[in-house]
Design a protein with these regions (language model features):
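Short alpha-helix capping/helix-loop boundary micro-motifs
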Residues: 398, 449-455
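Electropositive polyanion-binding surfaces
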Residues: 4-445, 461-499
């Protein structure tokens, strides 16, 4: 439970709960336009809304309206300092630790339906090839016409079923899907990497009891919003870079060549056919490796190997490009409710004229931004770890209630003492070598595999196992399994390693 200071609480209750006429002065009125939000069914903090039209010249006009949080959270105010402390919202299984007070996140800054909200609108004209031909942004006021859900939109996109209340929006949604696919195709042509969806989802009942565990579904609606947010962040980053003033970029640098080659060599030694890496600087090369593996059932294991060869993304005032997205410049501005640097970018855009004409000192601004970038990057990793550790506790609870269940699993990593394994449901655990029920296996440190000297059968990363619960330790968030080698896997591995 987050404890707020008196100053923070006072600021929360001093904020308006609705948009006033005074607030709307100087803003573009988009309240009559078909603008909607598309989020998860339980989302309360909605900070992005989308609208679309098609121009007579055949180009698409995409409007992405983002909650104007900086209008309410003044720079250096108590709530701003709180945001700098938290830096991000942390989404646990059954709760949210908000970056901002929930009365703000879910109230005046949330783009709730049928009420006016203050926004920054990013207007992007995109041609049928997916190229950005025009970009502008402006302060606006919107009135979202509907709170849509991914699930409902996917019914339209995947099953041609229109849920109640969606009838007036079908044409717009289909046009959005058309544009999203065009953007997706351009991203692939540029070399953008798709490591697949390896995010776990826990299905809970009303009491918080785990009913099931599965891969988080990423259907057409989820991809639509992802593509729209990516193209918005791309357009803004390119615009600001060309403008030449201080800004915050989301960098993902080129991977170290030796790391990439080491991982590809390991994957090749496991029997998979992968072309040798000549130039890892080009994302098309890594894209080709991914495409040669993504049809495999165990791809979620192989992709985690490839991900380890990548550098970590981070925030910086220096533009280094985004390797994974295959973009020359990238930013993150589409979630100012839940990410500090998105909020910081709003402050920059609010004061762009003062920065440009020198009223705001560029060197002082850069120093301040560098410190915020460093903290946000660090805290992002902490938040990811917190979510991961919370997930492991839920994994333990799920398995403890299914102790007699046999899980299909794969080897994710092999150490000198044990194997790290992951089930199809993305539940992680370990198997000590003594807990392999199919004979004695010896570790080969050079090849990083296990081999049974009697049968010559090898266990390597990606090998399939039958997993049975052995024990759990909640304090250390550890699941231990016994393992049984899948008969078919044994035959396949022998075939692979004979060549």
């Amino acid at each position: 439970m987050v404890r707020y200071s008196k100053e923070e609480i006072d600021q929360v209750y001093s904020l308006p709960t609705e948009v006033t006429d005074e607030d709307k002065k100087g803003r573009v009125d988009l309240t009559d336009e078909n603008i909607v939000t598309i989020d998860g069914a339980h989302t309360k903090d909605m900070d992005d809304a989308v609208g679309i039209t098609k121009k007579p010249n055949g180009n698409y006009l995409l409007k992405v309206s983002i909650s104007h949080v900086s209008r309410y959270i003044k720079y250096n105010s108590p709530l701003f300092m709180r945001a700098c402390h938290n830096t991000t919202s942390v989404y646990l299984i059954d709760s949210v630790n908000h970056m901002l007070h929930p009365q703000i996140s879910n109230g005046i800054c949330s783009l709730n339906p049928n009420v006016e909200r203050l926004t920054k609108t990013y207007q992007i004209e995109i041609n049928p090839k997916g190229e950005i031909v025009d970009f502008t942004f402006f302060d606006s006021v919107i009135k979202s016409k509907k709170k849509m859900t991914y699930e409902d939109c996917n019914e339209i996109f995947e099953n041609n079923v229109v849920p109640d209340g969606y009838e007036p929006f079908v044409n717009d949604l289909l046009l959005m899907q058309e544009l999203a696919q065009i953007i997706e195709n351009r991203r692939k042509e540029n070399g953008a990497l798709d490591f697949g969806n390896s995010e776990i989802e826990f299905i809970l009942d009303d009491d918080g009891t785990i009913l099931d565990v599965t891969h988080r579904h990423q259907g057409p609606a989820e991809k639509l919003i992802e593509n729209f947010m990516v193209v918005t962040n791309e357009a803004l980053a390119e615009y600001m870079y060309n403008l030449g003033i201080e800004f915050v970029y989301r960098n993902h640098e080129i991977p170290y060549d030796d790391k990439v080659k080491e991982v590809v060599k390991l994957i090749t030694s496991m029997g998979y056919r992968v072309d040798a890496i000549e130039n890892s600087d080009d994302p098309h090369v890594m894209q080709a490796v991914i495409n040669s593996l993504n049809s495999k059932e165990e791809f979620f294991i192989l992709s985690s190997l490839l991900l380890r060869s990548m550098q970590k993304a981070y925030f910086s005032t220096e533009n280094k490009g985004h390797y994974g997205l295959a973009l020359n410049a990238y930013s993150q501005t589409t979630s100012p409710i839940r990410r500090l640097m998105d909020l910081i970018i709003e402050y920059i855009l609010d004061n762009i004229d003062k920065i440009y004409d020198g009223t705001i000192d560029m060197e002082k601004l850069k120093t301040s931004l560098n410190g915020l970038c460093e903290r946000a990057s660090m805290m992002e990793r902490c938040a990811d770890k917190a979510e991961y550790e919370a997930n492991k506790l839920y994994m333990i609870d799920y398995v403890l209630k299914r102790q007699d269940t046999e899980f299909d699993g794969y080897i994710q990593e092999i150490t000198p003492r044990y194997m790290v394994v992951k089930t199809k449901e993305l539940i992680e655990g370990i198997v000590y070598f003594d807990d392999i029920l199919d004979g004695n296996y010896a570790y080969n440190p050079d090849c990083k595999w296990l081999e049974n000297p009697s049968t010559r059968h090898r266990l390597m990363i990606g090998s399939k196992l039958k997993l049975h619960f052995k024990e759990a330790n909640r304090e250390y968030r550890l699941l231990k399994f016994n393992a049984e080698v899948n008969t078919l896997e044994r035959e396949m591995t022998l075939t692979r390693t004979k060549n």
